[in-house]
Amino acid sequence: IITASADPQWAAGIALRASVVATGQACQSIERVYVARAIAEPFLAALAEGARGVRPAFPPGEGGELGPFIFPPQAAKVQAQIDDALAKGARLLAGGTVERLGGGYYLAPTVLADVTSDMAVMREETFGPVIPVTIFADIAEAIALANASDYGLAAAVLAGSIAEAAAIAPLLEAGAVSLQDGALTSIVSDAPN
């Protein structure tokens, strides 16, 4: 959940990192983003710009930040979720197509706006670098949307202050709630190579 008081550029950076860590295949990757209407457009613009800057790590040894899917059938499942969302009216802001490069399947970070609860990407576990974004009117709506998921291993709250984030966290039905960061990814990012 990203509140109206959060800086949209800052929140976009965290949402991107938390959604694509380990190609979105980490158990605590953020799979759904709920952003306040007041900051939605600058947030979406920053998120899409950041996503377009992430490169596949192919060919090996030539840089890049994003690896392949670990299980080829997962690439097909994720592509089907993207296609379902687009067919039902989602807007594609970045990414969107799985590519076969060498022996692996890669997907650039995919940003979907205007997603709805009837889309597979919002109902199912994605396990890929897809960032579906729903805009909410007030924090009660955001909490209801977040808690409507069958999944709840991890959640995150980004706000203008730690106090605001901490007030929202106990209302979320999740095993772990990160405040001002994305689902414990700072631990992964700070780990030595």
Regions found by a protein language model. Name each.
Residues I1-T116, L145, L179:
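ALDH superfamily catalytic-core signature
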Residues I1, A6, E99, Y106-N193:
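Conserved C-terminal structural/oligomerization subdomain of aldehyde/semialdehyde dehydrogenase
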